[in-house]
UniProtKB/Swiss-Prot annotation:
Lineage: Bacteria, Pseudomonadati, Pseudomonadota, Gammaproteobacteria, Oceanospirillales
Membrane topology label: Peripheral membrane protein
Localization in the cell: Cytoplasm; Cell inner membrane
Pfam family, any one: DUF489
Assigned GO CC terms: cytoplasm; plasma membrane
Source species: Hahella chejuensis (strain KCTC 2396)
PANTHER family: HIGH FREQUENCY LYSOGENIZATION PROTEIN HFLD
Recorded family membership: Belongs to the HflD family.
Keywords: Cell inner membrane, Cell membrane, Cytoplasm, Membrane
Location, primary (coarse class): cytoplasm
Protein name (Swiss-Prot/TrEMBL): High frequency lysogenization protein HflD homolog
Xref: Gene3D superfamilies: HflD-like
Length: 205
């Protein structure tokens, strides 16, 4: 995959989309279905030929692009401060994962196993979501710094929602890994903000 800013914006939108979906689920008990499916399916795209191929098409990433643009334009709704916190923590945790070859191997093996399950179940089926959630718990959740999800206890107490949140956080890690693979670095968010904004706005439909 090419080291260019367009690919980095796509991957970064994937990070922010996962963060936004976690926030929706935690506070509203529901998620935007198209965005949700797009993010989950990205976990299964292990042989993608391009960054966009990971997500299928740019339409599935519209939520992530909107969130990214709002942050870079500094027009983020105060009610969505948690989205930024989740996204930045995902980028931080990816850095930790990147140093753990053993963990990356485990994740790769487990994703391959989950991929075989999709021969019988849709990516959004509870069995697949549960498998993603278990993978997140066995790997990313073992780091001292965890993502503390805040929201309505009525929704957070539901086991199915908890699994969905973990699956979405795993998708966020996947996007952060992709972002690094195509040359993404945190300093670019500050020093290349205007260019990233221009590209993200061009992708927005």
């Amino acid at each position: 995959m090419s080291y260019n800013l367009e690919n980095q914006v796509i991957a970064l939108a994937g990070v922010f989309q996962s963060a936004a979906l976690v926030d929706q689920l935690a506070k509203q008990g529901t998620v935007a279905p198209t965005s949700y499916e797009c993010s989950l399916k990205s976990l299964l795209k292990v042989d993608a030929t391009s960054t966009l191929d990971v997500y299928g098409d740019i339409y599935g990433l519209q939520l992530g692009l909107k969130e990214l643009i709002a942050v870079l334009e500094r027009k983020q709704d105060r009610k969505k401060v948690d989205v930024v916190r989740y996204a930045l923590t995902l980028l931080y945790l990816e850095g930790k994962v990147n140093k753990r070859g053993d963990m990356l191997d485990v994740m790769s093996q487990r994703i391959a196993q989950i991929n075989t399950q999709t021969l019988h179940f849709e990516p959004t089926h509870t069995n697949i979501i549960s498998a993603f959630a278990s993978l997140y718990s066995d790997t990313i959740s073992t780091f001292p710094q965890r993502i503390q999800v805040t929201g309505d206890p009525r929704f957070l107490r539901v086991d199915e929602n908890a699994d969905k949140i973990r699956a979405l956080l795993l998708a966020g890690i996947r996007a952060a890994v992709l972002w690094r693979q195509v040359g993404g670095r945190r300093w670019k968010l500050f020093f290349m903000r205007k260019k990233i904004l221009q590209i993200a706005n061009g992708m927005l439909r």
